[in-house]
């Protein structure tokens, strides 16, 4: 892994490869749910999993909404 990166996303890359193979436009937006450490100092699993999963989902939704509004010129 390149030390200049904080994360690697292999799942979206696979989806992109399938879309490319079939000539389908593709844009992937992901929210990262697990990073280094625990900035919220939560109890362990499963609390951390569910809290950070929701934060990641909310962040991905906000980015997607902003992208679509910008793309549509709203």
From Swiss-Prot:
Residues 1-19 form the signal peptide. GO terms for biological process: nucleoside metabolic process. GO terms for molecular function: catalytic activity. Disulfide bonds: none annotated. The keyword Signal applies. The keyword Signal applies. Pfam families: PNP_UDP_1 (PF01048). Transmembrane segments: none annotated. Keywords: Signal. This is Uncharacterized protein Mb2315c.
């Amino acid at each position: 892994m390149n030390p200049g990166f904080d994360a690697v996303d292999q799942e979206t890359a696979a989806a992109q490869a399938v879309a490319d193979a079939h000539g389908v436009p593709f844009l992937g937006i992901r929210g990262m749910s697990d990073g280094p450490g625990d900035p919220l100092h939560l109890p362990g699993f499963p609390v951390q999993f569910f809290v950070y999963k929701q934060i990641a989902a909310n962040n991905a939704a906000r980015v997607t909404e902003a992208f679509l509004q910008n793309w549509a010129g709203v």
